[in-house]
Swiss-Prot record:
<dbReference type="GO" id="GO:0005794">
    <property type="term" value="C:Golgi apparatus"/>
</dbReference>
<keyword id="KW-0844">Vision</keyword>
<keyword id="KW-0472">Membrane</keyword>
<comment type="similarity">
    <text>Belongs to the PRCD family.</text>
</comment>
<dbReference type="GO" id="GO:0002046">
    <property type="term" value="F:opsin binding"/>
</dbReference>
<keyword id="KW-0256">Endoplasmic reticulum</keyword>
<keyword id="KW-0966">Cell projection</keyword>
<dbReference type="GO" id="GO:0007601">
    <property type="term" value="P:visual perception"/>
</dbReference>
<keyword id="KW-0333">Golgi apparatus</keyword>
<keyword id="KW-0716">Sensory transduction</keyword>
<protein>
    <recommendedName>
        <fullName>Photoreceptor disk component PRCD</fullName>
    </recommendedName>
</protein>
<dbReference type="InterPro" id="IPR027937">
    <property type="entry name" value="PRCD"/>
</dbReference>
<keyword id="KW-0449">Lipoprotein</keyword>
<dbReference type="Pfam" id="PF15201">
    <property type="entry name" value="Rod_cone_degen"/>
</dbReference>
<feature type="lipid moiety-binding region" description="S-palmitoyl cysteine">
    <location>
        <position position="2"/>
    </location>
</feature>
<feature type="region of interest" description="Disordered">
    <location>
        <begin position="24"/>
        <end position="54"/>
    </location>
</feature>
<feature type="compositionally biased region" description="Polar residues">
    <location>
        <begin position="35"/>
        <end position="46"/>
    </location>
</feature>
């Protein structure tokens, strides 16, 4: 009984990891596209600002 439960829980965890790595499509709304692009710009600009400080 315990072995079966352990096996099923392990398989469930592995399947979750496998399917959770799929890329989710961005929302079709304009707000989603704008917020996504601004987030990428913020991350890139913060990375560029840190490089000269070193």
């Amino acid at each position: 009984m315990c072995t079966t439960l352990f096996l099923l829980s392990t398989l469930a965890m592995l399947w979750r990891r496998r399917f959770a790595n799929r890329v989710q499509p961005e929302p079709n709304g304009v707000d989603g596209a704008v917020s996504g692009s601004s987030l990428e710009t913020d991350l890139q600009s913060s990375g560029r600002e840190k490089e000269p400080l070193k």
